[in-house]
């Protein structure tokens, strides 16, 4: 338990953030932001591992690297929506401006929100605490 970044009070969750991220800078940002809230992060580099773990230990938030894991991220979105226990888990993603055309496709596939990479880094602590509450 810890105080959340938005001042909502104590964050009470024993579930983790699951991320499918290959960008090491972004993965580090996610871990640091979650650690500040005393929330654990499970980072995966393959959709198969991600999905196997999500079925046994549902996360409270999914973060997807839509730039470096585009195909696998769409596979994760598809599988999340097929599974009754996981279909309500919020998924967010991030892309660079160069791959911005992926944003509407990801939102149509079930991503709650797709951030530009620079915005994602700025919003990360608030984003995690918002979904943890």
Please name every model-derived segment.
Residues 1-16, 31, 127-133:
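Non-catalytic signal-transmission and effector/linker regions of two-component phosphorelay proteins
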Residues 14-24:
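Conserved acidic segment of CheY-like receiver
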Residues 64-80:
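Conserved phosphotransfer microenvironments
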């Amino acid at each position: 338990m810890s105080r959340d970044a938005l001042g909502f009070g104590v964050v009470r969750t024993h579930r983790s953030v699951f991320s499918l991220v290959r960008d090491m800078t972004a993965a580090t940002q996610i871990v640091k932001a979650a650690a500040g809230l005393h929330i654990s992060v499970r980072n995966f580099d393959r959709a198969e591992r991600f999905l196997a773990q999500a079925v046994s230990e549902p996360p409270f938030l999914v973060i997807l690297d839509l730039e470096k894991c585009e195909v696998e991220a769409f596979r994760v979105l598809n599988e999340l929506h097929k599974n009754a226990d996981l279909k309500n888990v919020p998924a967010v993603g991030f892309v660079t401006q160069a791959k911005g055309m992926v944003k509407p496709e990801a939102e149509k596939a079930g991503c709650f929100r797709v951030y530009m990479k620079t915005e994602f880094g700025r919003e990360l602590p608030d984003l995690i605490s918002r979904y943890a509450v």
